[in-house]
Amino acid sequence: MTLAAITYTRGSLSILNQLLLPHQTTYDPLHSACDAWHAIHEMRVRGAPAIAIVAALSLAVELDALAANNQLSPEPKEVEVFIREKLEYLVSSRPTAVNLAEAAGRLGGIVSAKAEVRGVDGREVAEAYIAAAQRMLEDDVKDNRAIGEFGARWVLENAVATGSESGSEKGKVAVLTHCNTGSLATAGYGTALGVIRSLHATGSLERAYCTETRPYNQGSRLTAYELVHDKIPATLITDNMAAALLARNRAGSAASVGVSAIIVGADRVAANGDTANKIGTYGLAVLAKYHGVKFLVAAPRTTIDMNTKTGADIVIEERPKQEVTRVRGPRAGEEVDGLRAMETITVAANGIDVWNPAFDVTPAALIDGIITEVGVVEKDASGAFHLARIFE
């Protein structure tokens, strides 16, 4: 059964509460843009593509309810203003993720164009919005599968396959990934994890490695959950083990499977290729460069922000200090009907200052390719990405 982070039918939206994973599977209903804002800000739903879709669909559900209760203005301009204000509010929930802002801008444009049509009423403006939001859900899964196929092909053609010394089959690859970029971060299949899924589906994956991804543990809680669910051969490591793992490539250890590529997702890609992603991504890119391992970013074109010139222009969200100083989970061994009581414990000294940026920026110079739904973008001979070409 395929994992679903988002369940939607017209007028009804629920999200898988990712704060409770992997211990509890609970779907939270969202009835309005306000509900979605809190779900996104609290990270019950996360991943740049997923939050954009949830935000868009939450407003679609709210509009449906207003129309059903005859509370929707008949005036097209009033409905347009209402929708635009709600979209602006939703964007404020996670400002670093460009997909949300891009979706809001695109949906707002659709609504404005509809409102200008002579003879339309407010309900028709709302219907135009709802139809566009629903298409986002459908398109994301299709785009993710394309990313997976393009990325898998590129890795097999350009990355060094794992060696015979490790006991692996010739032509297979091992991939390291960071954070969570799978079905739980998108409408389905995933971006970077989608590439891993595609490699596994063709029998080309030797092993996937996933980082714990402190401080929110998206790797150990979510990516590991997806890999186990899909029965993909995988190993969990802590963030500070990545260098040692890559060093085993050079050592030629008979006990190890060499890493062929590091593939990550993105929350925002600047026009020059600089990429904002989960904190720790930059460090992995530096390690990849030193160890001669290919470093790839997997993201749909909606994540590429051509209006942001470089990574220096990307606003980095800072999260609460408690995410670093506390850990939440069930007490080991205490289970009742498959559910466990969740507890929060403190793991740091009281009074210590905390710096907790949610993202870092990886310079384009450290990135070998950007995998999109229309192909893999590589740098030219001068070392520059030309991302505008994929929008032509």
UniProtKB/Swiss-Prot annotation:
Origin superkingdom: Eukaryota
SUPFAM superfamilies: NagB/RpiA/CoA transferase-like
EC number: 5.3.1.23
Active site: D267
Catalytic activity, reaction form: 5-(methylsulfanyl)-alpha-D-ribose 1-phosphate = 5-(methylsulfanyl)-D-ribulose 1-phosphate
Pathway: Amino-acid biosynthesis; L-methionine biosynthesis via salvage pathway; L-methionine from S-methyl-5-thio-alpha-D-ribose 1-phosphate: step 1/6
Site (Transition state stabilizer): C179
GO biological process terms, semicolon-separated: L-methionine salvage from methylthioadenosine
Molecular function in Gene Ontology: S-methyl-5-thioribose-1-phosphate isomerase activity
One GO cellular component, as annotated: cytoplasm
Principal cellular location given in the protein's record: cytoplasm
Keywords: Amino-acid biosynthesis, Cytoplasm, Isomerase, Methionine biosynthesis, Nucleus
Annotated compartments: Cytoplasm; Nucleus
Gene3D superfamilies given in the database record: translation initiation factor eif-2b, domain 1, Translation initiation factor eif-2b, domain 2
Pfam families, sorted: IF-2B (PF01008)
Protein family according to the UniProt entry: Belongs to the eIF-2B alpha/beta/delta subunits family. MtnA subfamily.
PANTHER family: METHYLTHIORIBOSE-1-PHOSPHATE ISOMERASE (PTHR43475:SF1)
Function as written in the Swiss-Prot or TrEMBL entry: Catalyzes the interconversion of methylthioribose-1-phosphate (MTR-1-P) into methylthioribulose-1-phosphate (MTRu-1-P).
Protein name: Methylthioribose-1-phosphate isomerase
